[in-house]
């Protein structure tokens, strides 16, 4: 091929930029080497003979020179460099402090020489030297001066060069082009450009393609280029400026919607696009050209001999292999290795003919680089079943003080597809020590001794999932899952997984065991997070929320990691004192769904109140108080005129609260009875959710009388409201106002403190239907509005909701526990310790079965008691065993309320208990002067008497109360089965 002589026009001033780096030893490990930082870009200068008036060459050339110097590019492609520019512009740039050499290629010269309608590779001479230069034309005969296809009016082409960084000796390959306007010409020229890049860069040096390519991201020629290079706009860590690059010399151009036709592509291991800039700066209020300069700050590192990169500090280290695998995830303090060198992501997409098509990284080609404390893995192209897809994946792994952050960016350019799911990071074949137990925040918290056995259980509906491949535990944040984290907790160390995502988008906690094909056993553990981008062609999705922390110490360290993140968005007001002092409530249905009266308004201040007082309970959670009855007629809630209507109810509430009680008034926050006046008015169908076919989503509640007809055939049917719909908000506001006007001390909205696992709202207007994956955020916004409406007007007017998801309960004064959690894996310690300020109840104790154990759990964990006898059909007096034991428990709570009710839950910290068989917790009073230690014998099986000695350093025992046959002698507690004792310690003076 012909080579042109290098023509240099030098300037004297030096502009210090991110391109100059001192030399370094190539023998050093990659993490210790000096990186090469370089700014590479493109700038179409616009022919000097085209502009008029203020855009004439004589008036804009100074602006253009200033723009070149101000951008400070180390290397850039200049397009439309005509003879007048070539004669004047370099000197103008020099005079303003530039120091550039301009290597031009004119497609109108047989040798490519000269400056007639030329393009140029421009580089700083104090930073780089040019080692070679090549050029070719856009035609069927690219080595001859020619034009081709449907663009014969102009001659087009490309030029390329190898540049050596003077300080470090590193070499890079740069190709510059001004693509044709003709569609056919662009489509044919793109593969020529790729082929010549391969030919002229046989060593596969870091490679860059820059220029005005006269195309769009979604066009086929761009897809061809992305088969070889990566588009820095799609892959850069940071984007500055506008999406559009062509301003059409009009300051009124909407640059965010203007065409993006100027591109900076890159390729190569060790190359990181840190910052993409479209510079829209104006000079004297005008653009210097009809294109904006575009440049990218790159960091280039040498690739280590084994192709892997490692980041480490004193706490944690992570290593990524040359194939993008997670080679190591290590606790540096203990030496525990958790990774096994497996891949760390999966992707699923839909096409028009198939759904949930799996993409695995093991069959992809990756590019890996490191910059500072961040490793980046690029996948410029995705392959599935031998077919290439125009989708890009970027993974950024960075090290923080106590954790590793796993960020990701997805770009979909494949027509008629949507990226549905991205599973990342994945810790496959996890190396878990035998003492590590699996923690999830399901129902407030569960702890499983054997992760493999727990996850490996076959589902209740076998093989609906491909359980011949893996077994999975379904854990979705917000859907009965209180926190967006889980962990593997050992005695002295553990592994914390957190999705620190303040968008509160749908997130699954990936808990799987895969089948080992060599043994047939399901014992290959995998942990991670699953997100749902729904990324259509032409869209980018990003997430930087997911972290993994190999921590040292007890699980309280992991709790601190989560709480530190929570504090960045937590917005919980001071809870009304009456709520904090509430020990229990009676939850009672007055009129049931099918019309039966269980209680009347007159009973509120009669047997209902008397029953509550018998156990020290002064709160009533009132259900079914309206004419239609419980779970019927929502959201009409018609006054029950047969009992005197709202006036009679208001009078009964006033009398109840005058006796020192508190009434909590119930509404459902989302269900719309399809027989209600609200629904039949036409509004209901407008505000309700729709599924992936556009049909209404329905829920049914199968309460029955004593026959079978209701439950089997005649259930009530409800539509489900869309949260944050303005009309539905107004409904909730009016219900809240009505509760306040009735004199209730609290309004409660059922089903607003969590999200459902399936019944989200779908948008069916796009090529593929899309679900709303931000249900938590919308519920949170709704609850915040409800809270704030009465925050100043009536600060003691409390707001409650069912469910205790952290992002939602921050706006509530209390929550009703959902779902019930009373099995052997119950372990709400983590949630309770992380959120000691939250007031929430238990659930599920409905009769006289297993009462002491259940009630003891609520005292140990600082929960309030939800008295829901016979699922709210009865009152506590109907269950004498429960009544008797709860009376003892509430007396203890009242006696030690400064610690148990108003103090801070402190778990097992601050004291010692000599017997690990005894369940023990501590609560510290607000003044820090007293600590209550709760101890209980919760051992099931054959009854045994056990004892423990409790010591609190710097404190002395001053008081104690017990249930059952428990005894306290000194600091020793002796406990029969399901006995409990509370021991109060006071700080020694």
Question: Predicted segment positions?
Answer:
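N-terminal, active-site-proximal structural segment of metallo-dependent hydrolase catalytic domains
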Residues: 2, 6-7, 14, 21-93, ...
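Metal-dependent phosphoester-hydrolase catalytic domains
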Residues: 26-28, 127, 198-208, 215-304
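Acidic/histidine-rich helix-loop elements
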Residues: 42-61, 139-154, 180
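Structured beta-strand-rich core segments of catalytic domains in phosphoester-bond hydrolases
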Residues: 79-171, 277-278
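Polysaccharide-binding surfaces and accessory modules of carbohydrate-active proteins
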Residues: 306-311, 316-317, 329, 334-384, ...
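Active-site-proximal substrate-binding groove within the catalytic cores of carbohydrate-active enzymes
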Residues: 539-545, 735, 775-963, 975-985
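Active-site-adjacent "subsite" loops/lids of carbohydrate-active enzymes
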Residues: 665, 669-742
């Amino acid at each position: 091929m012909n080579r042109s002589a290098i023509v240099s026009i030098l300037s004297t001033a030096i502009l210090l930029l991110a391109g100059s780096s001192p030399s370094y030893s190539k023998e050093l490990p990659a993490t210790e080497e000096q990186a090469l930082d370089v700014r590479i870009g493109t700038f179409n200068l616009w022919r000097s003979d085209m502009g008029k008036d203020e855009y004439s060459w004589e008036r804009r050339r100074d602006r253009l020179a200033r723009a070149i110097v101000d951008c400070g590019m180390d290397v850039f492609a200049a397009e439309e460099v005509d003879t007048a520019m070539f004669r004047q512009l370099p000197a103008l740039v020099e005079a303003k402090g530039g120091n550039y050499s301009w290597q031009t290629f004119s497609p109108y010269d047989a040798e490519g020489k000269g400056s007639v309608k030329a393009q140029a590779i421009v580089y700083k001479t104090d930073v780089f030297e040019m080692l070679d230069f090549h050029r070719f034309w856009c035609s069927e005969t690219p080595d001859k001066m020619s034009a081709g296809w449907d663009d014969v009016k102009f001659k087009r082409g490309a030029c390329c060069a190898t540049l050596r960084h003077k300080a470090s000796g590193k070499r890079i390959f740069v190709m510059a082009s001004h693509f044709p306007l003709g569609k056919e010409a662009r489509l044919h020229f793109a593969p020529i450009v790729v082929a010549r890049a391969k030919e002229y860069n046989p060593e596969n040096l870091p490679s860059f393609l820059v220029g005005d390519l006269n195309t769009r991201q979604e066009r086929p020629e761009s897809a061809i280029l992305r088969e070889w290079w990566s588009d820095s706009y799609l892959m850069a860590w940071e984007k500055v400026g506008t999406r559009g690059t062509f301003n059409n010399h009009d300051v009124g151009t909407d640059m965010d919607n203007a065409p993006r036709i100027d591109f900076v592509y890159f390729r190569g291991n060790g190359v990181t696009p840190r910052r993409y800039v479209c510079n829209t700066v104006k000079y004297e209020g005008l653009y210097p050209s009809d294109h904006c300069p575009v440049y990218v700050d790159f960091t280039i590192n040498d690739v280590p001999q084994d192709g892997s990169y490692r980041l480490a500090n004193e706490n944690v280290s992570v290593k990524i292999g040359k194939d993008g695998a997670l080679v190591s995830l290590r606790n540096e303090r203990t030496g525990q290795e958790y990774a096994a060198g497996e891949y760390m992501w999966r992707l699923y997409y839909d096409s028009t003919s198939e759904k949930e098509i799996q993409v695995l990284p093991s069959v992809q080609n990756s590019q890996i680089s490191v910059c500072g404390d961040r490793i980046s893995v690029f996948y410029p192209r995705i392959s599935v079943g031998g077919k290439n897809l125009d989708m890009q994946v970027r993974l950024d792994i960075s090290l923080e003080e106590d954790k590793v952050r796993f960020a990701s960016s997805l770009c979909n350019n494949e027509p008629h597809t949507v990226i549905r799911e991205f599973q990342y990071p994945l810790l496959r074949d996890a190396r878990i020590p035998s003492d590590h137990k699996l923690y999830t925040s399901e129902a407030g918290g569960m702890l499983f001794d054997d992760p493999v056995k727990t996850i490996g259980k076959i589902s209740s509906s076998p093989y609906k999932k491909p359980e011949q491949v893996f077994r999975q535990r379904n854990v979705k944040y917000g859907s009965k899952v209180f926190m967006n984290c889980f962990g593997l907790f050992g005695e002295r160390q553990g592994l914390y997984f957190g999705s620190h995502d303040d968008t509160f988008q749908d997130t699954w906690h990936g808990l799987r065991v895969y089948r080992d094909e060599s043994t047939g056993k399901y014992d290959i553990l995998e942990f991670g997070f699953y997100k749902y981008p729904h990324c259509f062609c032409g869209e980018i999705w990003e997430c930087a929320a997911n972290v993994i922390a190999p921590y040292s110490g007890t699980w309280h360290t992991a709790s601190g990691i989560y709480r530190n993140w929570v504090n960045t968005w937590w917005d919980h007001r001071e809870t009304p004192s009456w709520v904090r002092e509430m020990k229990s409530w009676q939850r009672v249905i007055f009129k049931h769904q099918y019309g039966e009266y269980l209680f009347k308004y007159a009973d509120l201040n009669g047997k209902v109140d008397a029953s509550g007082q018998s156990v020290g309970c002064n709160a009533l959670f009132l259900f079914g108080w309206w004419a239609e009855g419980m779970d019927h007629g929502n959201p009409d809630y018609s006054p029950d005129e047969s009992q005197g209507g709202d006036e009679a109810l208001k009078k009964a509430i006033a009398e109840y609260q005058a006796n020192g009680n508190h009434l909590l008034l119930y509404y459902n926050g989302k269900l719309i009875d399809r027989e209600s006046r609200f629904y039949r008015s036409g509004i209901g169908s407008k505000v309700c959710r729709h599924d992936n076919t556009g049909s209404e989503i329905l829920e049914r509640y199968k309460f029955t009388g004593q026959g079978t007809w209701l439950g089997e055939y005649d259930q009530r049917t409800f539509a489900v409201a869309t949260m944050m719909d303005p009309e539905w908000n107004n409904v909730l506001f009016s219900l809240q106002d009505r509760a306040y006007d009735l004199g209730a001390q609290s309004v409660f909205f059922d089903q607003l403190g969590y999200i459902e696992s399936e019944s989200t709202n779908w948008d069916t207007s796009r090529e593929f239907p899309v679900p709303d994956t931000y249900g938590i955020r919308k519920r949170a916004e709704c609850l915040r509005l409800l809270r704030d409406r009465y925050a100043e007007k009536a600060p003691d007017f409390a707001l409650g909701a069912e469910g205790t998801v952290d992002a939602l309960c921050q706006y509530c004064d209390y929550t009703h526990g959902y779902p019930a959690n009373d099995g052997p894996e119950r372990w709400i310690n983590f949630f309770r310790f992380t959120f000691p300020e939250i007031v929430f109840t238990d659930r599920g104790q409905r009769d006289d079965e297993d009462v002491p154990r259940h009630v003891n759990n609520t005292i140990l964990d600082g929960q309030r008691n939800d008295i829901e006898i016979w699922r709210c059909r009865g009152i506590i007096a109907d269950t004498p065993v429960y009544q008797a034991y709860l009376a003892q428990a509430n007396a203890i709570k009242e006696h030690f309320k400064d610690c148990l009710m108003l103090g801070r839950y402190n778990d097992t910290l601050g004291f010692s208990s000599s017997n690990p068989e005894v369940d023990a917790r501590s609560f510290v009073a607000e003044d820090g002067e007293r600590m209550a230690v709760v101890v209980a014998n919760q051992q099931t099986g054959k009854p045994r008497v056990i004892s423990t000695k409790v010591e609190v350093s710097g404190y002395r025992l001053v008081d104690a109360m017990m249930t059952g046959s428990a005894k306290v002698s000194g600091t020793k507690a002796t406990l029969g089965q399901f006995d409990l004792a509370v021991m109060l310690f006071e700080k020694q003076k």
